[in-house]
């Protein structure tokens, strides 16, 4: 799977499904579930490493976990899902040269075929443009951008007219820069629909309604493994309680033997 395949999926109106993964087991499960894209997201800082936000995640962390995820794949190379790695906080906000160096390390050192970059501010636009010119595919990410939570919080974006116009303009700019896809997070459904219909690249939603070209979810949220669930992700099972109860049964039974 290559980034260009997702663009072709949109042309064919084929829904794109993505999940996050953080180790070989979650990577293997995602592959066996037949997802199109596996995102090694900076959410692993909280899901896997116990941090309270995505900000502490390092470049070394993302490289380590991206390789772990890929080792879980068992299908033929051409049948494996596309792997996209998040660029951690301060690996692309530090100037074009450093961003190229850090993104290059991710692509060179892992099986990732693209990186995801949050935001569309003028300085981020320059970074994205440079990365793409250097041959590194980029997935954009606008709306709620968790790496900016200290400034904007974690509230829903695009609820005012000004905010909606800003997000629409950012999406258009990201396509013009050459992004192969854009993640829209926690914005109104109809805004996502308007953006999707105005662009030729696929729009992947998370908390952006069902009109998008595809959906991505944090696997741990979907499986109910986290104590704090985002408002836009309804768990399909209460995984944490299920595993806890079953393990407690085993512990109690072993104590009686």
UniProtKB/Swiss-Prot annotation:
Its EC number(s): 2.1.2.11
Entry's localization field: Cytoplasm
Any one GO molecular function term: magnesium ion binding
Binding site for 3-methyl-2-oxobutanoate: 42-43, 86, 116
Subunit-level organization: Homodecamer; pentamer of dimers.
HAMAP family noted in UniProt: PanB (MF_00156)
PANTHER family: 3-METHYL-2-OXOBUTANOATE HYDROXYMETHYLTRANSFERASE
Protein name (Swiss-Prot/TrEMBL): 3-methyl-2-oxobutanoate hydroxymethyltransferase
Organism of derivation: Prochlorococcus marinus (strain AS9601)
Gene for this chain: panB
């Amino acid at each position: 799977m290559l980034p260009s395949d997702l663009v072709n999926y949109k042309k064919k109106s084929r829904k794109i499904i993505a999940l996050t993964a953080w180790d070989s087991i979650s990577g293997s499960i995602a592959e066996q579930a037949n997802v199109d894209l596996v995102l090694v997201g900076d959410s692993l800082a909280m899901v896997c490493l116990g941090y309270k936000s995505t900000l502490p995640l390092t470049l070394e962390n993302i490289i380590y976990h991206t390789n772990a995820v890929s080792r879980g794949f068992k299908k033929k190379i051409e049948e494996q899902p596309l792997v996209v790695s998040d660029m951690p906080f301060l690996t692309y906000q530090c100037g074009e040269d450093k961003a190229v160096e850090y993104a290059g390390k991710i692509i060179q050192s892992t099986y990732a075929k693209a990186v995801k970059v949050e935001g569309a501010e003028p300085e981020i636009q320059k970074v994205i443009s440079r990365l793409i010119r250097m041959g590194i595919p980029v997935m954009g990410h606008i709306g709620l951008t968790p790496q900016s939570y200290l400034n904007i919080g974690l509230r829903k974006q695009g609820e005012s007219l000004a905010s909606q116009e800003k997000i629409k303009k950012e999406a258009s700019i990201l396509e013009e820069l050459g992004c192969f896809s854009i993640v829209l997070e926690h914005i109104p459904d109809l805004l996502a629909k308007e953006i999707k219909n105005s662009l030729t690249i696929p729009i992947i939603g998370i908390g952006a309604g069902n009109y998008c070209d595809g959906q991505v979810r944090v696997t741990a949220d979907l499986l109910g493994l986290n104590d704090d669930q985002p408002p836009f992700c309804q768990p399909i099972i209460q995984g944490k309680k299920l595993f806890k109860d079953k393990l407690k049964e085993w512990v109690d039974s072993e104590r009686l033997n």
